[in-house]
Amino acid sequence: MKTLQMTLSNKKNNFIPYIMAGDHEKGLEGLKETIQLLEQAGSSAIEIGVPFSDPVADGPVIEQAGLRALARNVSLSSILETLKTIDTKVPLVIMTYFNPVYQFGIEKFVAALEKTPVKGLIIPDLPKEHEDYIKPFINDKDICLVPLVSLTTPLSRQKELVADAEGFIYAVAINGVTGKENAYSNQLDQHLKALSSLTDVPVLTGFGISTLSDVDRFNKVSSGVIVGSKIVRDLHEGKENEVIKFIENAINF
């Protein structure tokens, strides 16, 4: 079992915060201190976004964070170079669209990841049918390709998506982009229970989670939560203490 999956399997109430690399007053120089802050607060893993000019899955908060990072000339290459200098006990997960990886060179990208604490990859615009672009390069590495499973995904498709999944399953709690709050389906809890029954891989719930009541709800029917827009917004507004309290409360339900 790879590190990311082992880490999440050994815990309940997993909490994975999402941050945008380079969305800091110090640019990428601030990435290390943000990771340290999130690690010390009790995060199970940390998802790091790569800014992209056409972020189809991102809501306005994360899209704006990406634009701020791009304005600081943050790129996949500069992020990887920065991550090589960071030492953390918490597994990192890179969230990137496929085009930057393809332009960088897939084999070169994976080789660079191996020199960092990155243990997982989320590529939202890479469908299952095209995973062979990535999988052959990471199968024997301590890096997992994390699948996203939507509430509207048919059961037969869910089984395909989780069949050879590693790390964790990213269960998409709402239909649409990230940060769209209070739009949860009444069937969501049952969907998450059903999804969890298909696999031994931890299922974590994300998209739109912004309150401790959301966290409590999803901790009861999945292995934990991923919180993006709230974390990105609070960090941008200088509310580090609020972020720490939120994570501490979330993991201690």
Curated annotation (Swiss-Prot):
<protein>
    <recommendedName>
        <fullName>Tryptophan synthase alpha chain</fullName>
        <ecNumber>4.2.1.20</ecNumber>
    </recommendedName>
</protein>
<comment type="function">
    <text>The alpha subunit is responsible for the aldol cleavage of indoleglycerol phosphate to indole and glyceraldehyde 3-phosphate.</text>
</comment>
<dbReference type="GO" id="GO:0005829">
    <property type="term" value="C:cytosol"/>
</dbReference>
<dbReference type="InterPro" id="IPR011060">
    <property type="entry name" value="RibuloseP-bd_barrel"/>
</dbReference>
<dbReference type="InterPro" id="IPR002028">
    <property type="entry name" value="Trp_synthase_suA"/>
</dbReference>
<dbReference type="Pfam" id="PF00290">
    <property type="entry name" value="Trp_syntA"/>
</dbReference>
<comment type="pathway">
    <text>Amino-acid biosynthesis; L-tryptophan biosynthesis; L-tryptophan from chorismate: step 5/5.</text>
</comment>
<comment type="subunit">
    <text>Tetramer of two alpha and two beta chains.</text>
</comment>
<keyword id="KW-0028">Amino-acid biosynthesis</keyword>
<feature type="active site" description="Proton acceptor">
    <location>
        <position position="58"/>
    </location>
</feature>
<keyword id="KW-0822">Tryptophan biosynthesis</keyword>
<dbReference type="InterPro" id="IPR018204">
    <property type="entry name" value="Trp_synthase_alpha_AS"/>
</dbReference>
<dbReference type="InterPro" id="IPR013785">
    <property type="entry name" value="Aldolase_TIM"/>
</dbReference>
<dbReference type="GO" id="GO:0004834">
    <property type="term" value="F:tryptophan synthase activity"/>
</dbReference>
<keyword id="KW-0057">Aromatic amino acid biosynthesis</keyword>
<keyword id="KW-0456">Lyase</keyword>
<feature type="active site" description="Proton acceptor">
    <location>
        <position position="47"/>
    </location>
</feature>
<comment type="similarity">
    <text>Belongs to the TrpA family.</text>
</comment>
